[in-house]
Amino acid sequence: MFRVSCIQLRSNNNIHNNLDKTSKLIIKAIKQKTDFIITPEVSSHFSLNKKELLKICTSMQNDIYLNGIKKLAKKYKKWILIGSLIIKISKNKLVNRSVLIDRSGKIRTYYDKIHMYDVVLSKKEKYFESKS
């Protein structure tokens, strides 16, 4: 039987904290004999403030979260799909990128989300992906 684990966490703007939480959940899934692990969208960090994101986001090569997950994939010989993480592709441009990592810790492929959406959930909770 092929087992898939979907990790669920509530990311915030602390990439180190999110990596720690994700790593613990991945190891827990591995102990339950999973074969393939999937993390949620914006696993690495979450913020509605684009200026803040531009300060903390980096390229794929320098992304602390991505590099940490690659090490786990290699160490435990598991394929991991990062639902998405925010990657800086230029001084003022971010992308919401899904990344597939193989069991040797190498990136096999990635996909940049292109279907942005805007939603107003309440007076206080509003998301405007189209402005990122």
PLM features: residue spans?
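A short, hydrophobic beta-strand-centered structural micro-motif
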Residues: 62-88
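Active-site-proximal beta-strand elements of phosphoester/diester hydrolases
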Residues: 1-13, 18, 38, 97, ...
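Active-site catalytic loop in hydrolytic enzyme cores
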Residues: 89-132
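Feature marks short, surface-exposed loop/turn motifs that line or immediately flank catalytic pockets
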Residues: 13, 43-46, 117
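Catalytic metal-binding/acid-base residues of hydrolase active sites
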Residues: 10, 43, 85-86
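A short acidic, glycine-rich active-site loop
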Residues: 55-67, 126-127
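Active-site beta-strand/loop signature of hydrolases that rely on acidic residues for catalysis
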Residues: 4, 18, 22, 26-56, ...
